[in-house]
Amino acid sequence: MHGLLLAGLLALPMNVLAHPAEQHASNVLSRRGVDIESFRLPLKAKYMDSDAAAQKIQAMSFSKDDDYVSTATKLVKSTFPKSTFRVVDDHYIGTNGIGHVHFKQTAHGLDIDNSDFNVNIDRDGKVFSFGNSFFTGEIPKENPMVKRAFSDPVKALKGAVKALNLPVKSDNAKAKTTAGKESFEFMGTTGALSAPKANLVYLQKEDGTLALTWRVETDVGDNWLLTYVDAHNSETVHNVVDYVASAEFKVFAWGLNDPTEGNPTSIRDPWTDSSPYTWHSDGMTKYPTTRGNNAIAQDNPTGGSTYINNYRPQSPNLIFNYPWSPTATPPSSYKDFSITQLFYTTNRFHDLLYSFGFNEAAGNFQVNNGNKGGRGNDFAIVNAQDGSGTNNANFATPPDGSPGRMRMYNWTTARPNRDGCLEAGIVIHEYAHGLSNRLCGGPANSGCLNALESGGMGEGWGDFYATAIRLKPRDTKDTNYSMGAWAANNPKGIRAYLYSTNLQTNPYMYTSVNSLREVHQIGTVWATMLYDLMWALIEAHGGTYSANPVFRNGVPQDGRHLAMKLVMDGMALQPCNPNFVQARDAILDADRALTNSANKCTIWKAFAKRGLGYGAKYDARNRTGSNRLPPGC
């Protein structure tokens, strides 16, 4: 779903814990003086975990002959009998046997764009868990389609451009009708990477009312925005969603995070069964370059929006062997090595996530889905040495069926300058934005990680996977890791604290979020909890540092890969725009679905250590922490 560093603030972030503050890079919109953070969607979601769901559905009648979509639909109808809604066309059954069905609430035939209901159905066809953010207030009695008393979509486009100071010229814009109710594409504009679009939708506001809005979509490179412009007053912008997730950090053989951990080595045929066409074919065409079914990698020194004709190393024999030296300068002198490294890391992470269940039906990034579900034609476009920025990286995640786009930058924090493609953790973090945005809320919805807390978790998941993958056989629970240290030329990395199980080294607790106002700060808290969880599972199940997990009945047999699998499964279970408590419950539910809750108490203890235990409560202004465990633990 939606992407995550919307706009880094130019001011230093507030950090009540006495520690050097993180420095956040500003993106295009913040440089234009627009604070996108102030336009984030409000958190509206509720989540009913498997225990609560079992109690609720006892009084409901379901037929054994119902398929999982029908069962889910009946639940939504019984929960909101007076509401209208539609089934989103992105339902699928995960590798853990859980069926995921997503619904969008409607009013007068128009979507309420931030009103979602997700239902998870177990292997026996029963409701496993569900979450929703459906609107419960009064629906406007007057159908806006009757009198058509709303603004012209062109005015909405111009309103979005003006309010956000977008680099889009819309003076000659004309709206062309497209498929869908009140859906338009704009002709005659310049400045956007693709033609802007507009859809008439309702939007839940913070005050509990509905606003009729034009959802204006503009892809301007570093920001791919959905701007909700009031349909009666085009100068009013209610909220903004950004598909682009930016990071603040930055590979060699899989498991080596950066050049300080080893040297480049030659690896033959590294793909797994997750890539049946290999990394250099999409099942129809074989490519003698860094292009295939999962990704297409190239340099992009100008920072432009086109990529097909950009430079890629060519090798008819598929031997991509290029020199690199830590003293080489500028980074463009080793662009062949850089592009190859980026292509390798991206594909390697694709294959790992596929083994965990991020496959075609779940909305992964592939051109050819091989009739396995989902929407194809959406490999990851990955740009090395992208000239549109420095000291950062980002990933844009549109809905399933449209390619993801990663931009990796050079870092000017060292002499010679460093190439972010050579720090695997940054590439993994960025690609993880694509993972979480496609899973949370369903592959067709890319706006479910746009609230402050859910957006923070989006950053945290990226850090977690980057850190989990770099673990070494010598590591113990006392091992600490930084994020982005090599690229930033700072051993402490780019986060406020090291990732550590030691509460003195990293004192972050659940209630720390009360004083944090930036997604990367909040993400560090969430990733810290997941780091504790991973080590708790390693202590319970042992660790393996092989590149590929070993499964038994679908369950990874070591704690490190089990943690990665459970965290990923939780993403698909939780509601749209979840909070920490709901995401914790979704991980517990993921363990119930996968192992019959074999790790229940281990998971509870890990979260309780950081104040997200039994009884912890979410409140946007005053979260309540708890170190307690539930009965039975």
Swiss-Prot record:
SUPFAM superfamilies: Metalloproteases ('zincins'), catalytic domain. Residues 1-18 form the signal peptide. Its cofactor is Zn(2+). Its main location: secreted. Residues 19-246 form a propeptide. It is found in: Secreted. One of its GO terms (biological process) is proteolysis. Pfam families: FTP (PF07504), Peptidase_M36 (PF02128). Zn(2+) binds at H429, H433. The active site is at E430. Keywords: Glycoprotein, Hydrolase, Metal-binding, Metalloprotease, Protease, Secreted, Signal, Virulence, Zinc, Zymogen. InterPro entries: FTP_domain, Fungal_virulence_M36, Peptidase_M36, Peptidase_M4/M1_CTD_sf. Belongs to the peptidase M36 family. PANTHER family: EXTRACELLULAR METALLOPROTEINASE MEP. This is Extracellular metalloproteinase 3.
